[in-house]
Amino acid sequence: AQIRVVLRGDFMSPDGPIYDSQLYYVDILSEQWRGGTQASCSQIWNSFPDVGGPAPWLTTPDDPSGLYSAVSLYYLAGMLIANGEVDTSSCQDGGLVFGDELTASECGLDVAFSDVVEWQNRFDSDIILVANDTGVPAQLLKNVFSRESQFWPGIYSTYEEAGLGQMTEKGAETILLWNPSFFSQFCPLVLHQSRCDLGYGNITIDEQTMLHGALVTEVDASCPDCPAGIDLEAAHFSVRVFAEGMIANCEQVGRILNNITGKTAGELTSYEDLWRFTLVNYNAGPGCLSKAAKRAFLLGGPLDWLNIAARLEPACKTAIDYVEDISMDLSGVEPTATSWVFVARPLRTPTPRTFPTETPTPTPTITPTYYPGQPTYTATPTPQSYPVETG
């Protein structure tokens, strides 16, 4: 266990009069802690949040109303219009951008705005529940969903990403490899228990690939026969899967930093910056983060966000905007690009779901052209690509 005790009050002049009551701020990091959910990934990183609480984007409100947003989301409006949920016959352009059947025009957004607001808040209760179960900050999850998919939990026709957090098969691989608890729960839904007992790294490549596809299918809420073309039950369930994915990325970030420096992540930088590194890992991949961190370390600079961001290679620098947007209290309206998604391969035809809509979890339990607000894609990390430092 690790304990932090911070004196609170006027203690600057020990020999002089004390005007404040003697107060102590106490934090505990321990796997045996039973006093409530700890700040997510603190145990993995051995890192305490800032005294007084984390930044707003890393908080979890007491109830769903604390996540309420009313952002003009052009892509979400376009999907609602295209799926017949909003009547835009009053718009001369039909409510969509000319030549783009996925993005709402200004008129379309105006007509659809109340539906857009209702839709972007319909997952708030699930986000709060999952955040309380897993410790992944609720505001972080909501901002990621806004940035990735604008809360449209389906799959796109030209890019192999699915769900609220735009998961790829590489992103599925990250969860299954770096979150063993989730692997042990999900694997038996697809493979025989005897195979799952071997662990992710010891099953065959074909079995791993089968699991990747099954997990992407699980978070894909596309449903041609459902209202608005979305299976909302599957969408609600997928919130937990993406939270588990964030935990997997936390684990990978901790390992990357340890391989480079020989120290725990919490010894190197702040809790808030470690979450920024996790978002880089999620969006641009472990190779981008690892190279930047190694360069900063070899140059003797601090491993903080400003220094890591400055050391990102040109192809990785889109992650800076991604991180800066999500680390605002409300995410921006232009979801992000994933650099590793395979384009031009046909997507799977939606098939009847064969997995349970709930994964038993002990305590819980990832874009086309760049019109305003239309999702681009998300780089989800591949564990096999990050370097392992040897002594």
Predicted features along the sequence, with ranges:
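Cell-wall glycan-active module
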Residues: 1-210, 216, 220-226, 240, ...
